[in-house]
Structure formats: C-alpha cells, structure tokens
C-alpha cells in the first residue's frame, strides 16, 4: 500500500489528502451540529393553560440542564395556525436552551376554528399562566421574554404593546397576573393589518389579508367593522413608551410580510421615544437557512435585556 501511495503522482496525493480532510471536516461539523441541536433537557408537553371552544390551550415546557432562572415564551404560530403538544422542534430553540433559558412553547387554537383575536387573547393568558407558575418552573416572574416568527412575531408584538396588568378582582388567580413581557426578539412580523403595503396578501382595498379573511371572523367582510378589528389587532396602533426592548430580523426580499412592516413599526416607536432594533437580511425571503444562527443572536439579546438584568426587588 505504501509503495502504491508513493508511486502516485504528487498532485494526486495532495488531492486525496485534501478530499479526506474535507470529508473529515464535514463529518465533524455534522456531529457538532447534531450535538448542539439536541441539548440535554427535561420536557413536559401539553400543560393546559386554558380552554377555547371546548379545546385545551397548551404549553410545552422545556427546561435546560443548567437553567439560568429566566423564561422565554415561543409563540407557536404561522399564518395564525398553531401546533399541539410536542410540535415545537427542540433544535429550533437549542441556542436558547444552551443559554440556560427555560422555553415555553405557547400554542393557540388555529384559525379559522378560532379567530386571530381569540389567539391574541389566549397568548396573553399563556403569559399570565407562566407568570403565575413561575416558582414551579424555576424562573423569575419579572423576567419573561417572547419570540416567534411571522404570525408568531405578530402575537409577540401584541404582547409587547398591549400586554399588561390582570384583573385584580378576577375569580381565576391566573387572570390577576400581568401579561407584560420584558424583552422581544422575533422574525418578520406583520404589524399593520390595515396597510399591507406591497404584500402579496394585500387585497388593494384596505381589507384583511387575502388568504386569512376567515381567520378574522365574519365581521371582517364588513369594511367598517374590519377597520375596528384590524386596528385593534395591529401592533403598530398600540405602540407606547412602556414597550420592552424589541429586536426584529427581517429579510428584504420577503413578499408575504415585506420589510416595510417592520420599518413602519420602528418609525412609530421612534415617535414614542422607543428604540426598535431591526437586522435586515439581504435577499432574505419569508425564512432563510441560517435562522438557527439568528436564534443564537436572539439568545444574546435576551442575555443583555433579561439574564444580565438584576432581579426586581
């Protein structure tokens, strides 16, 4: 074998070595990615936080091996359709789990079985539930972050803009809790349902998104009523000075929820004296291959605005 190897031309030997080195590098990289995407956790699926139309509203709780005492809620929603217990892939939130964050996968009833407005109400209850049981999950009730993409980003911003105190005299103790969140990191949200701009979902008359009309209920077909619904369900109309730190990653080639949806929100926030950080992905459409790397950046954002913030009191 050695004689054969020596007999080969030098350029062939170099080529073989280069190929072997490349294959080894690919193998090691794949092994690392597999290890990184599968952290050691304790997972509880299907914790019921409420009901809607006779159906359970559920949260999955993913606790890392070394929790840092801070929770991040993931809005499991795309097109305002949600999954059920176990639907959130661990690999997608691996950077958060490896950062020590306890992850709460908040699911809602998918439209059109429930309306988008119902989903907004229900994810608010989800945050109240998490806060009420903070001690059970080993997290600080005053340091809860939220993340999601697309419809999940929209729901996250509704929490950022409208989440707030519960009802002090509510019979259900969960409803007495606040639904406010303390930091937000999201992907490509829709922020203005009354102005869909250059979106492929724009009907051209100020009406609801073309593919999601049923998701807003029968009143969405009545323009005067839709204007009330659309305004109430759009984060941009609820921007206020008390919003938490917000990070948005958005692609400049997104035709479903164009980048302008985020920049408009940023401009409105600036008018209120609030900074919203946008990271533009050149050529990025409604999702891209390196989103796991962006989740790692989200974890660093939460480090700055949640983990490294001293607990209240």
Task: Give residue spans per PLM region.
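Catalytic nucleophile-loop/oxyanion-hole region of alpha/beta-hydrolase
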Residues: 84-86, 92, 104-141, 288-293
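Conserved alpha/beta-hydrolase "acid-adjacent" motif
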Residues: 255-264
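N-terminal cap/lid segment of alpha/beta-hydrolase-fold proteins
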Residues: 30-66
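Mobile cap/lid helix-loop segments that gate and shape the active-site cleft of serine hydrolases
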Residues: 160, 195-238, 244
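Catalytic active-site module of serine/aspartate enzymes centered on a nucleophile-bearing elbow/loop
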Residues: 292-313
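Primarily recognizes the serine-hydrolase "nucleophile elbow" in alpha/beta-hydrolase
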Residues: 128-200
